[in-house]
């Protein structure tokens, strides 16, 4: 189990460069151990808690403190000329800058914690070291993308290259989550540069374009949240490379909500639909599986 968690964590490098000699194969699934809080109904209360919580977490994590302070120093220059959605705070922009700075390993550590930190609320409270960063980053994506997913327009077609793992679905038509903050690009060539073990082609309804905030804007990055649900529509192999096509259900699914404020892990994954109803999902699934 520990080895599998490590392998999955390596896959969280996403657009960030990682070359491995041996490429393990892991199945795609719903990532049930992911910490997938969406803070529905408690964002304002979490805003009050997050600022002192961030200070506490930075005091215990030197890299988090250094990364946050470095991004904070450049945020005012970055935000000039940006049109920010209502409610978008400096902390949300700084969180994106911290995540996209691949010159250190903080994004990797965050995604490792996200992928393995959702076993229980107790596990999250005791051992998840990025509670404030997770909140600020999730809220940033929610505010940038807006509510309703694809109800406001078509999803983004993006690409994600992974160099450390070959992901394979169990079968076509499965529902899967990426189970982490997943970096992707509007540019297929960029995705190829960051990994050839697996190439994902995705249509995302909840991923947010973060190019304007990114430390590396030329990557044309779209950041996909851990809780978005996708349908596996195609899978093939090109030599040693897995080619996976995922289509968003326009739906998210979370076991946690407001965990820091007392919300326990729910036994089932609670769905939050966008524009499509259940019947529409079934129709879409049948349509997409046809050749």
Swiss-Prot record:
Molecular functions per Gene Ontology: NAD+ poly-ADP-ribosyltransferase activity; NAD+-protein-arginine ADP-ribosyltransferase activity; nucleotidyltransferase activity
Which PROSITE patterns does the UniProt record give?
Answer: ART, TR_MART
Family annotation (Gene3D superfamilies)? Toxin ADP-ribosyltransferase, Chain A, domain 1
* Family (UniProt): Belongs to the Arg-specific ADP-ribosyltransferase family.
- The EC number of this protein is 2.4.2.31
Which positions bind NAD(+)?
Answer: 99, 160, 180, 214
Q: What is this protein called?
A: Ecto-ADP-ribosyltransferase 5
List localization entries: Secreted
Q: Which transformation does this protein catalyse, written as a reaction?
A: L-arginyl-[protein] + NAD(+) = N(omega)-(ADP-D-ribosyl)-L-arginyl-[protein] + nicotinamide + H(+)
Q: Does the keyword Heme apply?
A: no
- In this UniProt entry, which cysteines form S-S bonds? 42-258
